[in-house]
Amino acid sequence: MLWCPSVLVPLIAVAACLPVLAIGTPLEWEFAITLKSKILFVDEFWRTLASAAHEFDELSALTFDETEELIYFNDQQHRNGSIFSLRRDALMASHIAEQAIQRTGNESVGGLAYDPLNRNLFWSDTLQKKIFFASIDSKVTETPKVLVDLSQEGARPDGVAVDVCRRKLYWTNSNITHPTVESIDLAGTNRQVIIDTDIDMPRGIVVDQLSDRIFWIDDLKGVFFALKSARLDGSDRQLVLHDKHHEPLNLAVTNDAIYWTDKTTKAVWSHPKVPIVKATTTTSPLKAEEEDATETIPDIEPEPVAEVSALLRVANLSEEARGIVARTGFYQRLQKDEHCANIVRKVKERLDLMTKKKQMRSLVDEKTAQLERDHCLNGGTYIADRVLCICPTGFKGSRCEIRECHNFCVHGTCEISDRAYPKCYCQPGFSGERCEISKCSGLCLNGGHCKLEDISEKPSCECPHNFAGERCEQNSTEICALFCRLLKHEADIYVPFGCHDICEELAKDASDKIAIPQYHHLEVCMTPSPWTSNVIIVLVLGIVSCFFLVAVIVHGFRRLYKPKRPRIRKTFVVRKQARTNSSGDTPLTNRPLATEQCEITIENCCNMNICETPCFDPKLVEQTLAKSSNCKEDKKILIHNMDDDLY
């Protein structure tokens, strides 16, 4: 990112071209960014180097004086001051913030710019709709002067930028009904509207002395935004980038890139200065070649270049990113520029003159001047008759050699209070009169690790093994040892469950003093068995149910598919005395008399009480009737082989 032309003197070239600057040099930072409550300094690789201005609450715009290494910034909520200066002492790694412009009302600074030649600050007030300026050499209480009054026009001045070489001020009018980009001489004359078409809501603006162009941010309608550039007179307008979902506020330009802050993503983005699309109207190449053509060819809409846009997110921030400035080194690079060489020479002459004024003293009293120069330091007033120094605010010592803020704040920014005492504004995570106390200091005991995840919350402790509590102050080993000692004497005392292993370990060395708690079902809790009584009961019931279901199914199939045995009913008539009505009558063909015979089915033969006549085997009836039989023989032939003779 650093550019080293061959025309530079060797000392400047070495200072600017070193890739890693020595620690403590004033040129160690490349970009400064205002967040809501601090100013962030980063190097060319966007590594955070330091932060400052922690005592302020609502920072917005800022500008940078490269000649004297001063940052000028605005605080929207400070009660006394509106614009402040910040001098960063890299050798001391400290920052000194001083009030530059007093607050006059409820002003709201939109943009801030600095003229190093006349040492004037210019800023836009979005509430009063005016552009003010004031000299930093004037008294703080002096009222700022109005350069441009836009209140009657309904305009809303936003970003401002100074063209040091051509002595002009540029500003953007973000009134969406009639947005413009305008310029005026630093003397307050020759006001011009250089751009008033094809813009929606221009915000931040910057003058690039290296390319003689202006760059500005245009907050387009909807979710879109654009980065645009033009020559200093408004011609040759170019569209550098057209994108969406950003809310850009301010921008800075280096030799090869543009950087801007975005409130939506809380980040800083960059893009090359090479334009992607030409915003001016283009014509057909044929029209340029055919100069004598009578027919005009309609304008062709610009088309984007086929290359992919090199949009890059260079920094992620913890708060809203607002203002941004970059170190350009244009005083060294533009010493031979036709427009800037004269201004650079005058600035150097002014710096030399300031140095000489600091060294010059009145020749009227050479002794007093010599004493002031040698004895009283840092602007102290020498009292000759008392031979002492009256030190200015912020210094002390017999020769005013001690800066009261020097090494006073360990982790913070020092500022001299209204009572002339140093006061520290601590960085997040620190407190104390000198910001020497860390919120984590001495908090965690017994080797605990302190964590501070959120600045607004209390720090917490991560405790090692066998320690607990907010500060890791509770030793579980000692607590369990007390319980187990009491258990040795009182068997019914309750011992926490987690103490079993600890007491078991302690009992190895002092078994006579330590008792090991015996918990019910400890083994079951430690190694639980799956075969519980409930599981066994459910398993047995399931098996029995399965067997019963199988039996029912088998029986059903047997009933369904096995044929029934036919039931055959036979009736036999038994009689004791047959009638001899004819020659063909036989005992089996003639029914006996009612008193002498009995009719019975063969199935009921076993039920002997149905009739008085017993059952006889049919095959033997005829044989027995022809013979004389007795009672014993009748019993022998009763139901003889009846099952075999039914069918």
Swiss-Prot record:
Pfam family name, one: Ldl_recept_b
Organism: Drosophila pseudoobscura pseudoobscura
GO biological process terms on file: canonical Wnt signaling pathway; oogenesis; spermatogenesis
UniProt entry tagged with the keyword Glycoprotein: yes
Keyword Glycosyltransferase appears in the UniProt entry: no
Gene Ontology cellular component terms for the protein in this record: plasma membrane
Lineage: Eukaryota, Metazoa, Ecdysozoa, Arthropoda, Hexapoda
Carbohydrate attachment residues: 80, 106, 175, 316, 475
Protein's recorded name: Protein cueball
Membrane-spanning segments: 535-555
Keywords: Cell membrane, Differentiation, Disulfide bond, EGF-like domain, Glycoprotein, Membrane, Oogenesis, Repeat, Signal, Spermatogenesis, Transmembrane, Transmembrane helix
LDL-receptor class B repeat placement: 119-166, 167-211, 212-257
Disulfide bonds: 376-389, 391-400, 440-450, 444-461, 463-472
Domain EGF-like: 365-401, 436-473
UniProt topological domain (Cytoplasmic) ranges: 556-647
UniProt function note: Has a role in spermatogenesis and oogenesis.
Annotated family: Belongs to the cueball family.
Signal peptide: 1-22
